[in-house]
């Protein structure tokens, strides 16, 4: 039996010294009953199947386009059996949900306006190489299958992920390559042609972040991902997008079905719009100059009711068709949009009276909830976010069972959007896709500035509660997270703030004019063309998310919006720094976590037979102990004394020569520094005799140079005064008179306890 004819097209993307990546699209063999189906390959080992299906009958009672994107991660794709009780895949992973949103954002505006037939795009991960991402490949697969489906679709849409490694943007990077990268960006766009026939790529979606290791790389001299570098990344994506668009177009020429003339339900007829405009246009201009959200909504609701009654009267009188009643809401919204956008483009004034680049009033406060480990409130206008931080041992970090090589995550950000935040009623409970997406965006914004596991061995859960919403609660969550984390004592490398930018565009005198808006309101988001969220430190960008309702946005416009966002971010960081300018002391209710390094061959001895030894230590001290494969032991307890007691017992078993606070040693000076001297106590155990302690050896006189008092190789009697959480030793000199006095005291008291010093 002869098999089906397979049509294919491919694009070979050149990464220079990093080699090439081949993206291949095939059609004709798999999912033959779907309206459009494409198998997409990244090199040889990663394979996705995208199937686009369309309902036979329109949902004419819907006033929106019923598009559903589903990503199905199959465990067999990575050679795994699911870890659930029934050993089969369950609900989508967080990664799958985020990829669904990533695909939906550029695809949705590409279908014909007014389509009411249900459209479903299902992307199934059939095979994935261990070190690969599949998200940007999925954007291309979904676009390609939609191109073949016969649905009116203004594609192709292409998506690429790029990583900035050194001074090169590498397309379709691998997980392991991100360790060398400072910035990671995913861009989706389409190819557009201007009136002179010149081709360019219009950007439709951006998702980007600084990598987890970006801070250390930047400190080591790597390129800092500021606004100019991000703009370069958008430009670097264009040629790769053009190649992938060309490959999809080639496949569509071979295998696309004829475009079907599906019924299109336009939101309103022109006569309905004209009637609503005549009745409401002037009053809308007044309503949308009201700064207060609730007052504006009340005035708008009253005007809308009066206008609808007037339209109903015209229908009853035969002046308008019956359909005008069902078209009224869409027409009213369109007139509102015309009023708001016209004032912005014409006068440079927004509905609450602000200029294009003005920020609403800001307020920030920390330590607002008792007993929690860290808390803060950040307010921008009517948007109010409560941030709450919880710390625990690293064994409480999230364990991840997905197709990604990442198996655990110690920083979690969870975002909640209750209905009362907008003064409404609604369902509460498990998070929706939007909440998961917003939480992940705010999480990515903070990851680059978190302290390392070694410096801060805690699992961190950050929760953002949207208590009030009128524009960009996700960027408000970034600001609240910075405040709350610092209040909890987390030593962030730098504070992070976020701002949401909007865009209004229209054709004026034959030219498309754009106006970028800083700190958009909820209504400006709904009535505008773009939602562009930018988070970062004072020095570089840490996270970006772009959505647009247009066919695409020129990179020059995005470059200008990035620069405008930097000014706003700098102003917000000033407010955050006034509220808290560094990490606070950890709350008394927070656990204390310290670390001890033991020889790997001592791990078994510390655990004991069937865990007997480690369990006994935990029971006796009340501490929790976890052991890493490299011999790092994390000890967590409700207070410092319990943690210290557990550390002493661990050292007694695994590091019997480890010194303790209060012990005296005759040490040897091994190194002189400007701030003190390093003294060797035992093999591999050095401590610092700070210059303030060296003064005691000089009779309390000021010491300008440590070399004037001590020299390398000199013997000195010292006492351990402190062991910090990383095992570093602080020393003090034991003076002769002190030692003699202690000896006399001990002799006079005999067997009694020694006198207090």
Curated annotation (Swiss-Prot):
Alphabetized PROSITE patterns for the sequence: KH_TYPE_1, S1
GO CC annotations, alphabetized: cytosol
Obligatory cofactor(s): Mg(2+)
Location(s), subcellular: Cytoplasm
Residue numbers binding Mg(2+): 525, 531
Domain S1 motif: start-end pairs: 662-734
UniProt key word Repeat: no
Region of interest: Disordered: 737-757
Main subcellular localisation: cytoplasm
Domain KH: 591-650
Enzyme Commission designation: 2.7.7.8
InterPro entries tied to this protein: ExoRNase_PH_dom1, ExoRNase_PH_dom2, ExoRNase_PH_dom2_sf, GPSI/PNP, KH_dom, KH_dom_type_1, KH_dom_type_1_sf, NA-bd_OB-fold
Top EC class, one word: transferase
Keywords in alphabetical order: Cytoplasm, Magnesium, Metal-binding, Nucleotidyltransferase, RNA-binding, Transferase
Presence of the UniProt keyword Cytoplasm in the record: yes
Protein's UniProt name: Polyribonucleotide nucleotidyltransferase
Family: Belongs to the polyribonucleotide nucleotidyltransferase family.
A GO BP annotation: RNA processing
GO molecular function, one term: polyribonucleotide nucleotidyltransferase activity
Function comment: Involved in mRNA degradation. Catalyzes the phosphorolysis of single-stranded polyribonucleotides processively in the 3'- to 5'-direction.
Reaction catalysed by this enzyme: RNA(n+1) + phosphate = RNA(n) + a ribonucleoside 5'-diphosphate
